[in-house]
């Protein structure tokens, strides 16, 4: 099964035949992430240009979409960069350039907005009966020093957005973080992060004494 297709004339492969069309249920424009729920439904963060989240059933049939226009109004997005799902089927979208996480039900109806965790580049939810939401607060290296100081933060939250912890600082040493582009939540005490500026992945083991780190280069 394939969802979406880039026209051969785009991205330097030949002259453009026509301007980029408005969002279509089966045509993406630089999608950034994908997740499936327990029923096999597929959710796509159609990220860099279409600014929407889309739902398909397990056979790939279109079901629903968020608004699909760039903006700051509830339900609008500006670069939905990461997407994850909880046990109840709620969808969490890292609305990166708006500095917030938007939460939708399984039908992509907006339920909540969390705008207190910086610029979320990546989100994930731990497995198990009591789930936690993790979100990276990341910014590129060329930003001003005051912003760079928080490129290593990762927030740990209850699913209602309550922050229960925060760890990490900007840097390229072990245990420091540099523009976390992706997170995998293996469990509530162990996460994997991919850092695009430091060119590495780290495994962080969380505990009362703070995160312990191993990395792969």
Where are these predicted regions, by residue range?
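Eukaryotic scaffold repeat domains enriched in small/polar residues
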Residues: 1-217
């Amino acid at each position: 099964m394939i969802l979406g297709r880039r026209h051969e004339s785009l991205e330097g492969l030949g002259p453009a035949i026509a301007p980029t069309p408005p969002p279509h249920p089966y045509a993406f424009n630089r999608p950034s992430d994908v997740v499936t729920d327990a029923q096999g439904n597929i959710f796509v963060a159609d990220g860099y240009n279409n600014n929407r989240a889309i739902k398909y059933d397990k056979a790939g049939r279109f079901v629903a979409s968020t608004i699909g226009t760039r903006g700051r109004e509830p339900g609008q997005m500006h670069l939905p960069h990461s997407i994850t799902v909880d046990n109840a089927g709620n969808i969490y979208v890292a609305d990166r350039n708006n500095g917030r996480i938007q939460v939708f039900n399984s039908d992509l109806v907006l339920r909540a907005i969390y705008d207190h965790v910086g610029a979320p580049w990546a989100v994930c939810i731990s497995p198990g009966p009591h789930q936690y939401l993790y979100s990276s607060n990341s910014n590129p290296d060329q930003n001003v020093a005051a912003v760079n100081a928080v490129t290593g933060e990762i927030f740990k939250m209850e699913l209602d957005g309550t922050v229960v912890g925060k760890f990490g600082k900007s840097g390229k040493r072990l245990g420091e973080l540099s523009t976390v582009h992706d997170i995998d939540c293996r469990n509530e005490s162990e996460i994997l992060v991919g850092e695009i500026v430091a060119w590495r992945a780290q495994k962080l083991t969380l505990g009362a004494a703070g995160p312990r780190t191993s990395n792969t280069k």
